[in-house]
Amino acid sequence: MKDYRGIIENFFFILDKETQQPAQFRFNKVQSKYYKLLLEEYTDFQGVREIVLKARQEGVSSVVLAMFTVDFLMVPYSVSICISHRKDATELLFKKVKFFLESYCQNKKIPFENLFKTDNKNLIEHATNGAMFYVGTAGAKVGGRGGSASNILFSETAFYMDTAKITASEIVTATAQQVPQDRGMIFIESTGNSTDDYYNAEWERARRGESSYRPRFFGWQEFYDAAWVEKKKKELPNELLARRVYPKDESEAFLAAGSPYFDNLYLAEMLNNRQQPVAIGRLAADGQFT
């Protein structure tokens, strides 16, 4: 089994979130916790099927892309795919992958330009081992549908738009079929959006144990401190959106569709502050409580 973490932390650089300067890739708290969970669930990293709900910018997509990059470097003929919700987000994710590769080449003293047989805005192909890494944008033409893939990351899936040509469900379902059953890695990762979208439905299916994907939730408290989150929330227009972007629990991560009659914030407060019952039982016909 490959030591993904060892390779990533020893050879990959990433742009520091605060300084935007290159720094050695060191797993943060969420990345460390998630990687440990993956090791426990999938000892050989095969048949990985994960749906991740989290607060903003906790590093989940970064660590998944880094793992795919390790496969690009070390697994001959592997095919990794990343699909994001917007063109600009897709481009940024691909730049991150290329930054990993550039730092790896620098550490290994390999000419970066010699690493690729093909290198364009959507696809890179390894010059010697035949591995490929493809990126696409949800709603655009999804490449390689007829072929097979080793790894797929669906990034910010809750924000995939349903169009007349293709729905979010069709994008994920059709593309995921490229990975053979019980093989490879598929991640569906996102912050929450609406209670009536595909991602929410798939999340609820996973929570009920009706999906092949295992649900993981990482709230803001696993990465940020309370003072930082409160300050960040002031940049957002309302409390509901702030809770969706930085949820403390799963219930805060999705906005109810439409305009609910009852205020969700008050309902949540009532639930959290409810009195515990004095006793629990049944009232019989004779008036006895049992």
Language model: regions and residue ranges:
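Phosphate/NTP-binding elements of NTP-utilizing enzymes
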Residues: M1-T290
